[in-house]
Amino acid sequence: MEYLKYTPEMARDWKNAISASEGYLRKRVLDSMNESQLVSKMWLVEELSNLNVKPVNISLLAGWFAQYIVPLLYDNFESIEWIENFEMDRDIKSLAYKFNTRYKKEDKYKVSIKNVMFDNLVSLSSPTFDTVINCSCEHM
């Protein structure tokens, strides 16, 4: 995994997300777009590939804005049908959708506001998750 595919669709979505962020939320968006965030997500995707994992329905725990991980996963695993980002920070939801507009429009991505430490993540409408990715294990 050497790069993130920066497509015209991604450029549009990211511009809209960053333009929509204001004040403290803009600072948080910019903080989320650092080298270590991208490198760690690229490493994760590469390791999943090395293990020959073929994810279909992914539960993303504490995915924050998910601007790197969601496109990296979809671009590298044709098997993926669904990614659900479980995040407790209510402020990120609209911007996470802006970053990932194309996946939301295709009904392939959802943000659910949940505390992954205490809330039940599975509901009757949830798919059966075959892959769980914890993006914030150092905080739990």
Regions found by a protein language model. Give the residues of each.
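S-adenosyl-L-methionine
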Residues: 88-131
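Well-ordered, non-membrane alpha-helical segments in soluble/globular domains
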Residues: 36-46, 69-73, 97, 140
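Conserved SAM-binding motif I beta-strand of class I
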Residues: 79-88
